[in-house]
Every structure is written in structure tokens, then in C-alpha cells.
Amino acid sequence: MARIGDGGDLLKCSFCGKSQKQVKKLIAGPGVYICDECIDLCNEIIEEELAEANDLGLVELPKPKEIFDFLDQYVIGQSSAKKSLAVAVYNHYKRIQVGEPSTKGREDAVEISKSNILLIGPTGCGKTYLAQTLAKMLNVPFAIADATALTEAGYVGEDVENILLKLIQAADYDVKKAETGIIYIDEVDKIARKSENPSITRDVSGEGVQQALLKILEGTTASVPPQGGRKHPHQEFIQIDTTNVLFIVGGAFAGLDRIIEARSGKQGLGFGAQLRSTTEKKAEPSFADVMPEDLMKFGLIPEFIGRLPIITSVENLDQEALVQILTKPRNALAKQYQRMFELDGVELEFTDDALEAVADQAILRGTGARGLRAIIEEVLLPVMFDVPSRDDIARVVVTREVVLKNVNPTLVPREAPARKPTRERREKSA
């Protein structure tokens, strides 16, 4: 504790002006004093700034190849989409890192615009999972929104601001953290304009939603009701800047392949139509060939397409890819079910032809990787019901017949422990 001066006056904190009697501790320096309360306040300020720096990703940003390799551990195939996403995400967060503090006050500073991503491909091919895995790697808030539930403001349905509310909730209402998050908008093909020509009647769940999304995609300060706007109209709004929010927009875009085929001249009618050989007919147009004009014909408005400069696609998964999805990734389905049986002290084995049969069933159902779990659940349901109640089973073997013909899996019993010879038996043998 600092001592009382010669004049009899109490010493005071040089920062807040409180006397030594008003505080617990007063620390003296060369001509200055600081109290314990001001020290605590300084610590809080430093901790907040450090936390904010970490939330904004001001740590070492993984390089595109590192992002690609991380995605490879969880997502099978789709190399083109993974490369596009890795580069886009790296550039986006590099823009956030470098763009804010270093360019302030510089007249020659170049302002880098945001590049959102459009991800096209059939259902069950990993669009949502790719976005989830990216957010997991970067440790940023992540929210998934369904475009089919959205309507234009003033109509029954969800407002586009509800998408931002999900992101804020994912960040535990830390707005600064949410402002550097990732939002995945699924089923965006369902908000396509009903016809190529503008209609007199309002298209509140199609073109109207596209128009409403434009501002938040581009970057704006949006007012978000913390409890949803329509049920609680009288509430304070949360202000969130979407300039640094990365939007990944995905959809199956059924029928887009025919538009691509027609544009590329692979399809024709009449006497002037170009005939194709059998092999050419088998080669279907790829979503990788999509052009902005194809998306406009599908029903997306030019302004909406313009805010999604990066267009990439995922392709249908073949049998080999689906078998790899079942076995290779860290969280592969086969590994998950083997672990569940292991908890009951039972070994679960899938034969190679059984895995191929599961993959074939998923292709037949048209559900892609998303349908694999449902098929395995159907196959394993009887044994998952019985096994926990029995202690005589050592191993369960699933074969092709089990998957295709609804046969029960093979149950391998435990070996009975060797019986010790009794005294009577030993005497007889002697």
C-alpha cells in the first residue's frame, strides 16, 4: 500500500482518481499510481481483444492443399468440388485476415470483394457434408438453412433474416464471431422462377426469395429479430454485418442437365438434327459444363447468379465410391456399426460382396450416400434387437444374401471354455 504523502493527502490512482482508501490496493510506479480495479479492467480489455482476434481467425490459416487433404479424410471422391471449395474458402478468410487492419488509412488499398459459392449436384452426393466439414476444420460458426421454407417478407413462411438468426445462435449470440461464419442454403433450386419471363402475379417463394437474398449475399448490415420476427414483432433487433459471412448455396437442380445438353448442341429435332452414335448417347452432360445462361433458363435471376461467382459441382457416386464411403473415412458407416456391436462385446463383419450390394441398393433407390444408413439399419435390425440380450454370440457376419434376400446374418457362437477334468475322471483315466 502506498504511504500518505508529506502534505497529509491520500495518494490517488492516476487513472480513475480513486484514493487509496477507496480501493484494496494501490501500486506505485515512477510518478504514477494504479489501483487494483484499473488493473482488472485492463486485463478484461486485453482478454476481449485477444478473444476477438481469435474469433476473426487471426491465427495461421490452412493452405488450400491442407484444406483439401482434410476434406479427403471425411469425403470420398468429388475432387473437383473439394479443390474449388478449398481455394474459395482460403481466399475468403485470407481476405478477412489481411483486409481489415492493414488497409486502414491506405489510399492505394485494394478492396477485395466476397466470392460466394454455388454447389450443384444430385442428392446424397456430399454437398451439405462438404460445407459442414469445412466449418468444422476452420472452427467457425455454421448454419444450415432450407430455401424451401423461405418466402418474401409479408407472406406466410420464414423471412430470409431467419437464416442469419440460425448463424447467430450457432455462435452463442456472439455477433462478432457470427460475422465470420459459414451459411449453407440447401434446396436453392426450389426457389427458381416458375418461368423465364417475369410474371404479373407475385412469385413469393421463388423470385421474391431470390430478390430478398441479394443484399445479405452481397454484404449488408441486417436487422435480425432474436426470437423470430413474425411471432414477436416488438423486440430489439440484433445488427449483423454479412460482408464477411461466406454463403455456400446448394441444390440438386433436376432438369438442368437437359438445359446444358440443349445449349451444347448435343440434342436436336427435325431434319437438321445431328445424329449421335450409341456411345455418344450414353455420355450424359456433366454439371461441370454449366454456364450462367443455363442457370438463368432454369429460373435463377441474373442478379442472384452474379452474387455466386464460384460455381462448382458434385457428380453421382458409383458403386466403388459408395463402398469407399462405407469403409474409408474416419466416421465411415461400417466403422460406426462395428463400434456399436463392439460395445456389446460382439464383432461385426461385412463381406466385400455385402458392401457392394448395399451400394447397389443405394444406387437403385436414387438416394446416394444418404441412403446407405437406412439400408444398413434394415439389414441389421433383427440382430441389433437380439444381440444385446445374448452372451453366446461372438461374431455377426453380413453377406450379399443378407442384404438382397432378407436372410438373417450368420451368428458365430463363442467357443465354450474347456472343462477342467474332475477327480473321478482323473482316477478312471489312471
From Swiss-Prot:
<feature type="binding site">
    <location>
        <position position="13"/>
    </location>
    <ligand>
        <name>Zn(2+)</name>
    </ligand>
</feature>
<dbReference type="GO" id="GO:0051082">
    <property type="term" value="F:unfolded protein binding"/>
</dbReference>
<dbReference type="InterPro" id="IPR027417">
    <property type="entry name" value="P-loop_NTPase"/>
</dbReference>
<dbReference type="GO" id="GO:0051301">
    <property type="term" value="P:cell division"/>
</dbReference>
<dbReference type="InterPro" id="IPR019489">
    <property type="entry name" value="Clp_ATPase_C"/>
</dbReference>
<comment type="similarity">
    <text>Belongs to the ClpX chaperone family.</text>
</comment>
<feature type="binding site">
    <location>
        <position position="35"/>
    </location>
    <ligand>
        <name>Zn(2+)</name>
    </ligand>
</feature>
<keyword id="KW-0479">Metal-binding</keyword>
<dbReference type="Pfam" id="PF07724">
    <property type="entry name" value="AAA_2"/>
</dbReference>
<dbReference type="InterPro" id="IPR050052">
    <property type="entry name" value="ATP-dep_Clp_protease_ClpX"/>
</dbReference>
<dbReference type="InterPro" id="IPR010603">
    <property type="entry name" value="Znf_CppX_C4"/>
</dbReference>
<dbReference type="InterPro" id="IPR038366">
    <property type="entry name" value="Znf_CppX_C4_sf"/>
</dbReference>
<dbReference type="Pfam" id="PF10431">
    <property type="entry name" value="ClpB_D2-small"/>
</dbReference>
<keyword id="KW-0143">Chaperone</keyword>
<keyword id="KW-0067">ATP-binding</keyword>
<feature type="binding site">
    <location>
        <position position="16"/>
    </location>
    <ligand>
        <name>Zn(2+)</name>
    </ligand>
</feature>
<dbReference type="InterPro" id="IPR003959">
    <property type="entry name" value="ATPase_AAA_core"/>
</dbReference>
<feature type="domain" description="ClpX-type ZB">
    <location>
        <begin position="1"/>
        <end position="54"/>
    </location>
</feature>
<dbReference type="GO" id="GO:0009376">
    <property type="term" value="C:HslUV protease complex"/>
</dbReference>
<dbReference type="GO" id="GO:0008270">
    <property type="term" value="F:zinc ion binding"/>
</dbReference>
<keyword id="KW-0547">Nucleotide-binding</keyword>
<dbReference type="GO" id="GO:0140662">
    <property type="term" value="F:ATP-dependent protein folding chaperone"/>
</dbReference>
<protein>
    <recommendedName>
        <fullName>ATP-dependent Clp protease ATP-binding subunit ClpX</fullName>
    </recommendedName>
</protein>
<dbReference type="GO" id="GO:0051603">
    <property type="term" value="P:proteolysis involved in protein catabolic process"/>
</dbReference>
<dbReference type="InterPro" id="IPR003593">
    <property type="entry name" value="AAA+_ATPase"/>
</dbReference>
<feature type="binding site">
    <location>
        <position position="38"/>
    </location>
    <ligand>
        <name>Zn(2+)</name>
    </ligand>
</feature>
<dbReference type="GO" id="GO:0016887">
    <property type="term" value="F:ATP hydrolysis activity"/>
</dbReference>
<dbReference type="GO" id="GO:0005524">
    <property type="term" value="F:ATP binding"/>
</dbReference>
<dbReference type="Pfam" id="PF06689">
    <property type="entry name" value="zf-C4_ClpX"/>
</dbReference>
<comment type="subunit">
    <text>Component of the ClpX-ClpP complex. Forms a hexameric ring that, in the presence of ATP, binds to fourteen ClpP subunits assembled into a disk-like structure with a central cavity, resembling the structure of eukaryotic proteasomes.</text>
</comment>
<dbReference type="InterPro" id="IPR046425">
    <property type="entry name" value="ClpX_bact"/>
</dbReference>
<comment type="function">
    <text>ATP-dependent specificity component of the Clp protease. It directs the protease to specific substrates. Can perform chaperone functions in the absence of ClpP.</text>
</comment>
<feature type="binding site">
    <location>
        <begin position="122"/>
        <end position="129"/>
    </location>
    <ligand>
        <name>ATP</name>
    </ligand>
</feature>
<dbReference type="InterPro" id="IPR004487">
    <property type="entry name" value="Clp_protease_ATP-bd_su_ClpX"/>
</dbReference>
<keyword id="KW-0862">Zinc</keyword>
<dbReference type="GO" id="GO:0046983">
    <property type="term" value="F:protein dimerization activity"/>
</dbReference>
